[in-house]
Each structure stands twice: as structure tokens, then as C-alpha cells.
Amino acid sequence: MAIVLSPLHRRRLAAFRANRRGRLALRLFLALFVTCLFAELIANDRPLLLEYRGQWFLPVLRDYPETAFGGELPFPPDYRGRFMSERIARDGWALWPPIRFDARSINYARPAPAPPSAENWLGTDDQGRDVLARVIYGLRLSILFALGLTLASSLLGICAGAVQGYYGGWIDLFGQRFIEVWSGLPMLYLLIILASLVQPGVGWLLAIMLLFSWTSLVDVVRAEFLRGRHLEYVKAARTLGLGDAGMMFRHILPNAMVATLTFLPFLLCGAVTTLTALDFLGFGLPPGSPSLGELVGQGRDNLQAPWLGLTVFVVLATLLSLLVFIGEAVRDAFDPRT
């Protein structure tokens, strides 16, 4: 079934497509995101496909014991080790991913940190882990985390702004005073304190950051509801007996979403930046997790290895620039003056 767009939506889509920088940024961001989603197929220390003595194996999807390849241990083997390399070379063959390291694999054959080489394209960090593999996995984690935080904070912010703007009065007054006080709190310091009190984890970190990120959209949605509740079609719907929930989410919210959508790419930027800052300070993801903030810290601590700081700088600058360009293009496309 084809999606039929209204003339207004077609005009906005055409305006976005006419913005060459925004269109190119969206394509690059989607390509980067899709690539990171399949990180295990790009950077892994296990073969994608393995044939051994006439049997087929998928080590990237399933754990096989060493005994399946003539070994003695009932644990998964080191496919890059000497034992498996000799077995594969003699009795089979393997299809490897382009990068033969995952985010936690250590290259013991080279001193750490090691400069870029044919084996480690962007070098290794101070623990001997492949930098490019950690960048790919870290990008996926950062983007997925930012998307989850943006969606959750947008949902809370839209609901809070809708209630304040629709009902007004004491509800709006109390809500505004609370948001003013809450927004005035030193967010980064409180995030550090709260993150240090709980066990490090993605879920806890997402919940803690959600406490302070939901206020970003409240004022925008509130203003749209304050304006929309006095429009004629809303009064007509109220006269016909439509309830408050139907009025808010069926009639006023679609118009309020126009202003909300223009903020989403910038909220993604803020989420990525905050997560990177917390990881850099050591209060973010669990130790050992592939993260951009941890790479920033390694670049600071290993100035003799410039490839660490340069790599994470280019990655962060590229990611944030793409999101900003997308946000500017969306904002211009929804601008009624264009």
C-alpha cells in the first residue's frame, strides 16, 4: 500500500531534498549506522564461515568446543591462535571478516600501543586492542544509546508539555516552576554522583541521563499546545463532545510534532556528547566497553601515540557534524517561510 503524502508534507520533503548538504549528511549517517549495526560481520576474531574436514561451521553465530576441531578442551578455541591456524590451513578453510579483531581482542604480537599497520589499520590502544574495531563497536553503542535516550526523553517531554499547555492554570504554573528549578541543577555533577552510586550499566546510565534530558522539549510542546487549544477546530471538537485525551493527541499533538521533529537531531548530538563526556571521566559505561569517551581518555594518556587522539577526534567531529547538518536541513524544511 502506497503512502499518500499531503501537499504540505510533499513540499517539506522536497525542501529537504533540495538541501544538498543535509541530504548527503543523512545518507552518510545512515550508511555509518547500518555499517555499525553489522559490526560482528566486519570486525571479529572469529571466522564468518569455516569448513573443516567436510563439515561447515558458523563461528560468528555459534560457539563450538575445541573438541570439534580435534582439540582436547570443551571450550571455544582461539581461532587466530597457532592450534586453529594449523588445523584450518591443513584440513579446511575459513572466510574471515575484513578486520580480524573484535572490540576486546588483544594483539599480543605487537607492543601496545602500536601504530597503524596492515594488521591493525588504525593501530592498537594501550592494551593492545584494535582501534578500528573499538571505533566501530563504540559508534554502534553511542548511536543506539543516543537514539534510545532521545526517544525516551522526547516522549516524556512531549507528555509534560502537552499537559501543561492544554490545561494551563495551576498545572502550567507549577510545572514551569519545577522545570526552572530542575533545569538549574548542575546536571553533569549530579550525573557523576548518581553514576558513582550504582553498578555501571547501560540501563542505569540511560535512566540517570533521562532524569535531566526530558526537559528539552517541554517548552516547545507547551507553546504549541497553548496556541493550539484556542484554535477554531479544537473548539469545534470540544463542542462535539471529544474528550481531553482525544483533543490533545488527535488534534493538537500532530501540529506540535512539527516543532518537535526539528529538535531531534540536536538532541541526538547532546546525548552522544554527554555519554562521551561521562565515559571520558570514568563514570559512564562499564570498564572495557567499547566507547568513544574511553578512546578520548586513551588519547589524552598516550600523547606519544597520536593515532589514538586523532582517530577519535575525526570520528566524533564527523558524527556530530552529520547530525547538525541533518538537523539544520530538517529545520529549514519545516520552516513555513521556505
Question: Which functions belong to the PLM regions below?
Answer:
Residues M1-S154, I158, A162-V163, A271, ...:
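Gly/Trp-centered helix-boundary motif
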